[in-house]
């Protein structure tokens, strides 16, 4: 997974072509002897969502620190962003913004709900993927400037997977290096990627199910599903 201005969840689908309605299918790697396929779910707004909320809520940029605010905040509220539309796995653009159900800790609860909307979309992508792949990853690696602790913990809680935060800031560059090495030598480079932190599920199932049900109800209200 990578979270920057936008976000992406990429899954190695193996050597068999895999088509999943709602996800992007493409070739991950190919040469004369082998071909591997990729399933990808894209998220239109990650950091860009917080830039928008910063402006909408009148929060000075230096005081934003959304990850600190979200780390210290819980909410029963739900936020479905409409400005950027919803990409995977729904692919809709003209929808209604849903922002409701907050307590008294504003604007932090809105920021938390905005962050959770990213996690919900990751979980929806992951839930769809699980139905179609025979071999699933044992853990998930996250990179990018938006891969902050509260978001990664929330994704772990929803998916039930351990999330590792990559110590390597630019994993795109690593991918280019690996492909070029393979093209020139015929062998994959043995590159070890270290992890800074890991996040394991800790949310109770009752709470998780309640949150996911609220999210899907909000998607219907917004005209997404």
Indicate residue ranges for each PLM-predicted region:
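Active-site core segments that coordinate phosphate-bearing ligands/cofactors
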Residues: 1-141, 147-225
């Amino acid at each position: 997974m990578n979270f920057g201005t936008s976000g992406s969840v990429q899954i190695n689908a193996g050597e068999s072509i895999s088509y999943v309605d709602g996800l992007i299918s493409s070739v991950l790697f190919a040469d004369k002897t082998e071909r591997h396929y990729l399933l990808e779910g894209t998220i239109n707004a990650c950091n860009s969502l917080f830039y928008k909320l910063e402006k909408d809520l009148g929060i000075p940029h230096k005081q934003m620190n959304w990850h600190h605010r979200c780390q210290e905040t819980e909410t029963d509220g739900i936020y479905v962003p409409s400005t950027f539309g919803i990409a995977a796995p729904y692919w809709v653009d003209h929808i209604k913004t849903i922002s409701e159900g907050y307590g008294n800790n504003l604007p932090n609860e809105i920021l938390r709900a905005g962050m959770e909307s990213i996690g919900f979309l990751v979980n929806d992508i992951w839930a769809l993927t699980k139905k179609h792949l025979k071999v699933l990853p044992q853990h998930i690696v996250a990179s990018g400037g938006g891969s902050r602790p509260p978001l990664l913990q929330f994704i772990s809680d929803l998916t039930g997977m351990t999330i590792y935060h990559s110590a390597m800031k630019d994993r795109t560059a690593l991918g280019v290096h690996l492909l070029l090495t393979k093209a020139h030598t015929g062998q994959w480079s043995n590159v070890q990627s270290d992890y800074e932190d890991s996040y394991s599920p800790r949310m109770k199932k009752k709470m998780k199910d309640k949150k996911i049900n609220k999210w899907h109800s909000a998607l219907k209200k917004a005209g997404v599903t």
